[in-house]
Design a protein with these regions (language model features):
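Bacterial Sec-dependent N-terminal signal peptides
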Residues: 2-32
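Structural motif
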Residues: 21-46, 71
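N-terminal active-site segment of His-dependent metallophosphoesterases
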Residues: 25-26, 98, 102-189
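A short, solvent-exposed loop/turn motif at the edges and junctions
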Residues: 52, 72-103
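Short, acidic Ser/Thr/Gly-rich low-complexity loop/linker segments typical of extracellular
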Residues: 54-70
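Extended active-site neighborhood of metal-dependent phosphoesterases/phosphodiesterases
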Residues: 83-84, 187-214
Length: 214
């Protein structure tokens, strides 16, 4: 299933001694996560929401943030993508707006990370969002049943349709969102899913589905 829609139009505190945040949760315990958010070059972004999955803070006027996070429970540190900016992508077209907490960081009880976003040169409010769901690739030898996109062959058709649709849109940015079940209870096929995303030519945001977690 796929559809497309378009709207109408090393880290230091940087002098933030008073925790003068733009809003959100104020840390009261030991600081275990801190960093900066940049928006192209040396521009530091204020008011960007940063979360450890439980607590949320906003960057101050210097783009600085800190969280008193329980790193024994925290898996990722994420940043909201501020208006007027886009997230950089990896080689597969996955947007990078998060940091995975490492075992070394847990041992040290400290995460220091810098997020960097890219200014959007054209109208950031004019874009097309291509939404898909349930690619659920399975081995080519799995055969077919009543479930759509049962095999990798069907997934390739799915990716081709999205790629061809995106190619017709030249006057605005294109983004994708996959609404879960990117694989069918077989994470060994995740690399095949990524190979499909790599052909799309636009960034794909992904949401966890039950078959991805079972």
């Amino acid at each position: 299933m796929a559809l497309a829609c378009t709207p109408d139009e090393g880290v230091e505190n940087n002098g933030n001694k008073n925790n003068n945040y733009g809003g959100g949760y104020r840390p009261t315990g030991k600081i275990t996560v801190k960093g900066l958010v940049y928006g192209g070059g040396s521009t530091k972004l204020a008011g960007v929401v940063i979360s450890d999955g439980l607590l949320c803070v906003q960057t101050d006027e210097n783009g600085y943030f800190e969280i008193d996070s329980d790193l024994s429970r925290t898996k990722f540190i994420t940043a909201s993508i501020p208006s007027g900016y886009s997230a950089p992508t990896d080689e597969n077209g996955l947007p990078i707006f998060y940091h995975k907490v490492t075992d070394e960081e847990r041992t040290k009880d400290m995460v220091q990370h810098t997020f960097e976003f890219l200014p959007i040169n054209n109208n950031p409010n004019r874009y097309t969002l291509i939404v898909g769901a349930d690619p659920q690739p399975r081995a080519r030898s799995a055969g077919y049943d009543n479930i759509a996109y049962h095999s990798l062959d069907m997934c390739e058709d799915f990716y081709r349709d999205m790629r061809e649709k995106a190619a017709t849109i030249t006057d605005r940015n294109v983004y994708g969102m996959m609404l879960g079940d990117v694989v069918h209870e077989n994470m060994s096929l995740y690399t095949d899913y990524l190979a499909g995303l790599k052909t799309l030519g636009f960034p794909m945001f992904n949401i966890l589905g039950n078959h991805d977690n079972d």
